Design a protein with these regions (language model features):
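Surface-exposed helix-capping loop/turn segments at secondary-structure junctions
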Residues: 42-44, 121-128
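Small-residue-enriched alpha-helical segments and adjacent helix-cap loops
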Residues: 1-79
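Mobile "lid/hinge" segments at catalytic clefts and subdomain interfaces of large enzymes
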Residues: 67-125
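Hydrophobic alpha-helical scaffolding
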Residues: 20-28, 99-106, 133
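Generic alpha-helix signal with a bias toward terminal, lower-confidence helices
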Residues: 23-26, 64-66, 73, 81-83, ...
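A glycine-rich phosphate-binding loop feature that marks nucleotide/adenosyl-phosphate handling sites
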Residues: 7-17, 48-60, 128-144, 148-152, ...
Length: 159
């Protein structure tokens, strides 16, 4: 086993629909997909301290709202859809994450997180600047641009 405490693959994910009757989406497969992709990319140590938290419904048992990257699974017209929040912090500098905009279908979440991490690596001021510090310095807009670049017009939607 490889130690991953504090790395992108050290994800807190409430089990979601796999084990909870209140949940509206699955969290375990999303967490597994993200962890596997981060290991494939081999950038976990470069990324460093990153708290990814996933909840399977609005009850927020996975504490997505205080994840540096938070993922909230919802039911949208019978399909699992995942909202992304950024900038949450559960430490003494507590902050609730901000929604990035429209959610993503289950099959796009891993790529979404990968785009966020790629944006972070490009935006950070140096190797020692964490995801959360980078987010606080540059704000939401550059991350939204990375997430929603494929939409018409090439930019992020306004909320």
């Amino acid at each position: 086993a490889t130690a991953n405490v504090g790395l992108a693959s050290d994800i807190i994910a409430f089990p979601g629909m796999d084990y909870c009757n209140l949940a509206t989406s699955r969290s375990i497969p999303i967490a597994q997909g993200i962890a596997e992709r981060m290991k494939e990319l081999g950038t976990e140590r470069e990324v460093g301290d990153l708290k990814i938290k996933i909840s399977g419904c609005v009850n927020a048992c996975g504490h997505h709202h205080v994840g540096h990257i938070g993922i909230l699974g919802l039911d949208r017209a019978g399909a699992e859809n995942y909202q992304i929040t950024l900038g949450g912090d559960g430490t003494e500098s507590a902050a609730l994450g901000e929604r990035t905009g429209p959610g993503f279908p289950a099959g796009e979440v891993v790529g979404t997180v990968e785009r966020l991490i790629g944006a972070y690596l490009e935006l950070r001021s140096d190797e020692g600047e964490t995801f959360l510090k980078t987010y606080r310095r540059v704000g939401m807009q550059p991350f939204k641009a990375a997430l929603y670049a494929d939409l018409a017009g090439g930019g992020a939607p306004e909320l």
